[in-house]
From Swiss-Prot:
One of its GO terms (cellular component) is ribonucleoprotein complex. Belongs to the universal ribosomal protein uL24 family. The keyword RNA-binding applies. The keyword 4Fe-4S does not apply. InterPro entries: Rib_uL2_dom2, Ribosomal_uL24, Ribosomal_uL24_KOW, Translation_prot_SH3-like_sf. Disulfide bonds: none annotated. Residues 1-29 are annotated as: Disordered. One of its GO terms (biological process) is translation. Residues 11-23 have a biased composition (Polar residues). It comes from Onion yellows phytoplasma (strain OY-M). Part of the 50S ribosomal subunit. This is Large ribosomal subunit protein uL24.
Amino acid sequence: MPKLKKLLLKVSTSKPNTNPPSQNEEKGTIVKQEAPIHVSNVALVCPQTQTPTKVGIRIQSGKKVRYAKKSNQTLDEKN
């Protein structure tokens, strides 16, 4: 969903959705339904600590390098 800037992930991103009672049923039902999350709520997982982390950029030998701010570990290199 690029126009909405939302992602539908394979992890459990479900929200409860209520269905009102119909004429035949006594009670309404609560159904779990997959829901998209906004791009700003997605975080990179640090490979060392296995927790969400922010990403920093530093220059090493003339190249931009991304690193995890929690563990200070290099993630990959960019040109």
